[in-house]
Amino acid sequence: MRTLRFLISARHLCARGRGIPAGQALGTGNNAQKQVTCCLHTSPPPGPPQATSSAGSVTPYEDVFQREQRNKASFVEVLDLYCNRDVRRRGHVEIIEAALRWMTEFGVEKDLEVYNKLLDVFPKEVFVPQNYIQRMFNHYPRQQECAIRVLEQMENYGITPNKQTCFLLLQIFGARSHPIRKYQRMMYWFPRFKHTNPFPVPAELPADPVELSRMCLHRIANDLDSRVAVYQMPYTEKCDDGKEREHLHVVGIQSPSQVSLLAAHNPSTPVYVEGPFPLWLRKTCVYYYILRADPDPMRKEEEIDNERSLYYPLSLDLELDRDLGDDDSFDVDDVEEGPVFAMCMAGSGDELLLGKWIRGLQETNPILGQTPVVFRLNSGPQELSVPQEKEAEPKGELEDDEGEREPERRRMEQ
């Protein structure tokens, strides 16, 4: 009788949950037991899946990311909108992955506060393992992988986590989780590699092109005695016809050893202006030009006495314990290159603008007035896109410019 009462009560509960009429819930013996077993193990009725509401999907948040003004305030506003919508935070993985894709568009990819805000989207104390078996396996793997992707993006942009990041990860996943291990590795290596570069690039680059060129040339030049000279400052000139003509900057650098090397150059051998060569400073790419010559085949290296050479010292320290297979020296193919006499940075790769650099070098290097100068210029990115105003100029003005450049070019080749 006790078993029968339990089966009848279970039948009533199933009838309430599935909407079965109460009259069908009455039964005795084996019939009641069969009905309860059938009700407990029956799959849901076949049919098309019910459409979820648009509020529970992540697609509206993609639309919000596209619709809002792309700044930090609107990005945080979208995250607050999601957090205040539902306490259970359904779809939190999708919204975090969508936010990671849009961070560069909003300009917050290097903001630590925004990354902590993304981690705050996870529900708290839900994914913490409760026993050693859950800790042994990857507990809630999708959520842990999503948090690791957030930390990896922080690592790619060089952002060091803080104590709030650790507190959020402990509150969300616990102390033995994979995101915590990732956080510990980042905190171990980031402080060690933060100051390894002896020539660090400043976080904020100067906006002035002359100061930026001065800083870049100092980074390229290996001689501390190098002198930077500004041959032309950027300015705007008004022509007689009322049009404004913009003059770009020209900044060069040369060391005393390069001056002496150029003074010993044979005037009958031409020198070359080559470029542009790219130089990356974080996300900014600048271009520089060099003045060089071909290697002199008649030049003989001065033989150094063994007593005065550092490569042939008087005392030899032979490692007799090493075998021939222990040679860890590198096999380097020495490529003989020509001497580099000077470097410069200019607003454009125009021969007329670089000619002002050569004329400025003639003041400290008189031999350039007797040496032919040949321009070997590649099509840089600034020359690929021709403005529409220059394309619309009449042919007469272009011929006048060519006429002005021709005597300049002949004088340099003499």
UniProtKB/Swiss-Prot annotation:
Residue ranges of coiled coil: none
Keyword Lipid biosynthesis applies: no
GO cellular component: cytoplasm; mitochondrion; nucleus
Transmembrane regions listed in the UniProt entry: none
GO biological process, one term: regulation of oxidoreductase activity
Keywords of the record: Cytoplasm, Immunity, Innate immunity, Mitochondrion, Nucleus, Transit peptide
Keyword Membrane: no
Subcellular compartments: Cytoplasm; Nucleus; Mitochondrion
InterPro entries the record matches: ECIST_C, ECSIT, ECSIT_N, TPR-like_helical_dom_sf
Source taxon at top rank: Eukaryota
Compositional bias annotation for Basic and acidic residues: 388-397
Transit peptide: 1-27
One Pfam family recorded for the sequence: ECSIT_N
Region (Disordered): 379-414
Principal cellular location given in the protein's record: cytoplasm
UniProt family annotation: Belongs to the ECSIT family.
Function: Adapter protein of the Toll-like and IL-1 receptor signaling pathway that is involved in the activation of NF-kappa-B. Required for efficient assembly of mitochondrial NADH:ubiquinone oxidoreductase.
Record protein name field: Evolutionarily conserved signaling intermediate in Toll pathway, mitochondrial
Organism, scientific name: Xenopus tropicalis
